[in-house]
Amino acid sequence: VVLDRIVAAARRSFSENGWAGTSMRAVAHDAGVDPALVHYYFSGKDALLDACLQPPEGFLESITAAQTTPMRARGAALVNLLLDTWEDPAAAQVLRSILLTAAHEPVARSRLESLIAQAMVGAVAERLDSDDRHYRACLASSQLVGLAFLRYVWCVEPLASTAREKVTAAIGPTIQRYLNGPLEPR
């Protein structure tokens, strides 16, 4: 419980104040713990940032599980996975802090790029049967990351308040085309 409070406080600080504006002492104060406890759990600010950049529990497993959906329905499955994850308040808080921290911190951005490349693009590409599977996985991932930013981070209307079924119906076929449809212009 104490560790969770420390990480939550650090996520808030990194996403609001950046690397330079976050101190171990300020994180301890925000978490309501003695600064020695923060140093007990984390050897330094790098280790604290690493903990903050860990995806929500079950996130990576969910991406892998979505890949077992029959190919004809995988686009919609990936959209629903994203919507399910972001509509879980605890997961959304973690993801939002990761994205906001990565937006202005080169170290966090590099780690997020690695996570996306391995967990998202890699997991999607692994189950595709085509020579351009990594390119296709990148296209699908770009659409999903864009959806997350517009709907959940920036709350752009009308997308932010559109019923999830309508979002899945609109974006699922695009993801599906990226996964196994024609990529040439029509």
What are these regions (language model features)?
Residues 52, 56, 82, 86, ...:
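Generic structural signal for hydrophobic core residues of well-folded globular domains
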Residues 1-32, 43-50, 62:
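Basic, helix-initiating cap at the start of DNA-binding domains
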Residues 45, 56, 90, 112-116, ...:
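Hydrophobic/aromatic residues within well-ordered alpha-helical segments
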Residues 71-97, 103-112:
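Helical hydrophobic small-molecule/effector-binding pocket
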